[in-house]
């Protein structure tokens, strides 16, 4: 039995990844601060039975994260995988952004990700002692690779995620824990959708930002995460994989 914990599991990329891993036979513990979203998650995937568990967890709270992983540890002796997809988006120029928004971005996107990995690590290392290679996948962004106006603080958090990925990959390799990240471009998620265009038409402003002529769906990113969680990725460590339709390669400017 392969067991994965997924933060931000109730929506967006976390939801898509939960579905994908359940379909591939994983037992998934979905973590989110949205209790109604977790209830909806359980209802949507009730057919997977006891292979889906949920736990309320606010990654911005060290106490909440510790409690969630203590609960996981009491139920399971190990974790084979961790996907940190909980995230926050705030838009604004660096000279105008409120201190509260700046702090909130780092609290969730960087500190929350690190807290989750820190609390999960004993369970991930336990899988390594059983001869398995445990997996950690972080959600970075092409914003951490290529920056643009109005997203400086968000970009800084994602650049930090990339740095954490590479350092943790080296630190944890001896314990048979692989650490990688995916770096999506614009993805059609509830977090991103309000920032895309008037009227909620997610293709209105974004159809030209990718050489493929569309923005990503959560399933596009979940597929790459599933690969990194699979045995086929057993020699991939410290990688940051763009899932962007060629956006970074083409240097297509935002429209």
Annotated model-derived regions:
Residues 83, 173, 178, 236-238:
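Short, small/polar-rich loop/turn modules that mediate ligand/substrate recognition or access, typified
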Residues 95, 146-152, 174, 213, ...:
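Active-site loop immediately N-terminal to the catalytic Tyr-X3-Lys motif
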Residues 117, 157, 165:
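Active-site helix of classical SDR
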Residues 93-94, 101-106, 206:
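Substrate-binding pocket helix/loop in short-chain dehydrogenase/reductase
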Residues 141:
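Residue(s) in the substrate-gating loop at a strand-loop-helix junction
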Residues 122, 170-174:
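Alpha-helical segment proximal to the catalytic Tyr-Lys
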Residues 146, 226, 237-255:
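Short C-terminal tail/terminal secondary-structure segment
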């Amino acid at each position: 039995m392969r067991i994965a914990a997924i933060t931000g599991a109730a929506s967006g990329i976390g939801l898509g990844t939960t579905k994908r891993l359940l379909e591939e036979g994983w037992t998934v513990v979905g973590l989110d601060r949205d209790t109604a979203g977790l209830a909806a998650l359980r209802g949507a995937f009730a057919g997977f039975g006891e292979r889906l568990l949920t736990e309320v967890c606010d990654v911005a709270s060290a106490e909440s994260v510790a409690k969630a992983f203590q609960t996981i540890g009491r139920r399971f002796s190990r974790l084979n995988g961790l996907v940190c997809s909980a995230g926050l988006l705030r838009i604004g120029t660096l000279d105008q952004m409120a201190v509260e928004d700046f702090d909130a971005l780092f609290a969730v996107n960087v500190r929350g990700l690190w807290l989750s990995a820190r609390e999960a690590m004993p369970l991930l290392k336990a899988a390594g002692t059983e001869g398995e290679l445990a997996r950690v996948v972080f959600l970075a962004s092409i914003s951490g690779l290529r920056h643009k106006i109005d997203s400086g603080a968000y970009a800084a958090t994602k650049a930090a995620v990339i740095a954490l990925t590479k350092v943790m990959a080296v630190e944890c390799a001896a314990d048979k824990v692989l650490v990688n990240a995916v770096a999506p471009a614009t993805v059609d998620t509830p977090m991103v959708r309000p920032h895309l265009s008037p009227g909620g038409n997610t293709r209105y402003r974004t159809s030209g930002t990718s050489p493929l002529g569309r923005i990503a769906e959560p399933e596009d990113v979940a597929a790459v995460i599933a690969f990194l969680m699979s045995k086929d990725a057993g020699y991939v460590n410290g990688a940051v994989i763009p899932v962007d339709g060629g956006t970074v390669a083409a240097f297509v400017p935002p429209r």
